[in-house]
Swiss-Prot record:
Family, per entry: Belongs to the thymidylate kinase family.
CDD domains with a match to the protein in the record: TMPK
Function text: Phosphorylation of dTMP to form dTDP in both de novo and salvage pathways of dTTP synthesis.
Alphabetical UniProt keywords: ATP-binding, Kinase, Nucleotide biosynthesis, Nucleotide-binding, Transferase
Gene Ontology CC, one term: cytosol
Annotated protein name in UniProt: Thymidylate kinase
Catalytic activity field: dTMP + ATP = dTDP + ADP
Record-linked Pfam families: Thymidylate_kin (PF02223)
E.C. numbers: 2.7.4.9
GO MF assignments: ATP binding; dTMP kinase activity
An annotated GO BP: dTDP biosynthetic process
Residue positions binding ATP: 10-17
Gene designation per UniProt: tmk
Gene3D superfamilies per record: P-loop containing nucleotide triphosphate hydrolases
Length: 211
């Protein structure tokens, strides 16, 4: 059975982490070898970049293009160190965010040049695309309310304006419309159990070779 890259995307508080954990447990119960990872922060270098990207610094804000380049650096290291080797070993990779996040957040959210973003994504990934992307679609205000309810301080991106997060959401909607064979929308407002059931059905349909 060949390796597969399955990406989970969505706005803040959409439930990616919980659904990835449930999906990993399900796949492992089928005898599938699973790797769970994330961007940013899927490598040792990435952990340092994650801190730089997400910590709030009022007096020294991260410039928007700098932010874009840091995400690209994290992704390049992640692809070479984690994604390619594990795919070659036949593993199923569940990845929390990938290239679509950069398009949605830095492209739609920040308004940066989309051509530049696409070029950087291609350079960072060497053309490696996901086999399937699960987009957990939830209203941005509901998602942010969930995040605040976690009792953990919001990071720099989570503290952006509602308008920013709505632009990000629009980015995901347009990406899903543009790449329907790769990106599948899941209603993230359903119960955790219902969302997981839908995800399992999607994986069985889209990924051949599951036991």
């Amino acid at each position: 059975m060949g390796g597969k890259l399955i990406v989970f995307e969505g706005v803040e508080g959409c439930g990616k982490t919980s659904q990835m954990q449930l999906c990993s447990q399900w796949l492992e119960s089928l005898g599938v070898s699973v790797v769970v990872t994330r961007e940013p922060g899927g490598t040792e270098l990435g952990l340092h970049l994650r801190r730089l990207l997400l910590e709030k610094a009022e007096d020294k804000p991260v410039a928007e293009v700098t932010e874009l380049l840091l995400y690209a650096a994290d992704r390049s290291q992640h692809v070479e160190q984690e994604l390619k080797p594990n795919l070659a070993a036949g593993k199923y990779i569940l990845c929390d965010r990938y290239t679509d996040s950069t398009i949605a957040y830095q492209g739609y959210g920040r308004g940066l040049n989309m051509s530049l973003i696409n070029q950087l994504n291609y350079i960072a990934t060497a053309g490696l695309e996901s086999d399937l992307t699960i987009w957990l679609d939830i209203d941005v205000e509901v998602g942010l309310t969930r995040k605040r309810g976690d009792g953990i301080a919001l990071d720099r991106i989570e503290q952006e304006t509602i308008a920013f997060h709505r632009r990000v959401q629009q980015g995901y909607a347009e990406l899903a419309a543009s790449y329907p064979s790769r990106i599948v929308r899941v209603d993230g407002s359903l119960s955790k159990e219902a969302v997981q059931q839908v995800i399992q059905e999607i994986l069985r349909v889209h990924l051949k070779g599951l036991p």
